[in-house]
């Protein structure tokens, strides 16, 4: 990060003479090869989401989530009715392009266009969606929307510090760990220490390339098994990117 001094000799941050803010994401959908994200619609998505979430017999997909569990379709419908169409936190249903069915939700939140800060959160993926190309591409589409299309400077990922799957996902997706905010929230009758992860605009290019290579059809065999890991591809692209910067 560039640091400079003002007329008083004090250290100040880098100048942003051309910064005019980012755009609000709104509720516009996103589509890729495997996944499609559509603005959450109670009428269209509740039944499919309830069926998909019901694959989780134990209810563990709700442990680290501020919402749920939803034991009836009507309770999920009540939540989707309250969550859909909210500009402060636009929720999307994650659709499998092959089946056309919804099996997860994700949202943009903590949206601050004036500062160029936005977070991907509110994620709940049904067991059948987890660890699939559809799930990975859904997150990539949201990252692409925020960083490339809307011009955000900082993309955040936060989770309960004890939520090891979410922390592993953040690192796999190229986010960098920034620390833990202790006693940051309370939910479901317990304390939450929050782990913070972020990706900056200047870090996005090699991460984007890693995703694009991983999502390419040739990275998978006929059974859908990956040839190269996403984390390895991002690491490779980062090594090339920063080596080029050093030479320049």
Regions found by a protein language model. Name each.
Residues 169-170, 197:
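Conserved active-site tyrosine of GNAT-family acetyltransferases
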Residues 157-166:
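Conserved beta-strand-loop-alpha-helix junction that forms the acyl-donor binding cleft
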Residues 142:
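Flexible ATP-lid and adjacent glycine-rich G1/G2 motifs of the Bergerat
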Residues 148-158:
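Conserved GNAT acetyl-CoA-binding A-motif
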Residues 135-136:
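Glycine-rich acyl-CoA binding loop
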Residues 1-132, 145, 149, 190-195, ...:
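GNAT-family acyltransferases
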Residues 176-190:
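Conserved catalytic-core motifs of GNAT/GCN5-like acyltransferases
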């Amino acid at each position: 990060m560039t640091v400079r001094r003002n007329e008083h000799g004090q250290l100040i941050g880098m100048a942003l003479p051309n910064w005019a803010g980012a755009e609000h994401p709104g509720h516009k959908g996103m589509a890729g090869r495997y996944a499609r994200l559509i603005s959450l619609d109670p009428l269209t998505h509740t039944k499919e989401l309830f069926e998909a979430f019901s694959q989780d017999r134990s209810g563990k997909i709700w442990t680290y989530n501020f919402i749920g569990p939803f034991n009836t379709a009507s309770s999920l419908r009540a939540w989707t009715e309250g969550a859909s169409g909210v500009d402060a936190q636009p929720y999307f249903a994650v659709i499998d392009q092959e089946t056309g069915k919804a099996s997860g939700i994700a949202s943009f939140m903590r949206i601050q266009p004036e500062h160029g800060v936005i977070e991907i959160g509110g994620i709940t993926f049904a067991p059948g969606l987890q660890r699939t190309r559809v799930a990975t591409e859904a997150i990539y589409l949201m990252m692409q929307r925020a960083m490339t299309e809307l011009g955000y400077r900082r993309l955040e990922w936060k989770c309960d510090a004890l939520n090891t799957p979410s922390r592993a996902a953040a690192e796999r997706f190229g986010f960098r760990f920034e620390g833990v905010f202790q006693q940051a929230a309370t939910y479901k009758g317990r304390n939450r220490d929050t782990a913070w992860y972020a990706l900056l605009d200047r870090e996005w290019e090699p991460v984007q390339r890693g995703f694009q290579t991983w999502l390419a059809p040739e990275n998978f065999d006929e059974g859908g098994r990956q040839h190269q890991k996403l984390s390895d591809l991002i690491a490779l692209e980062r090594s090339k990117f920063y080596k080029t910067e050093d030479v320049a």
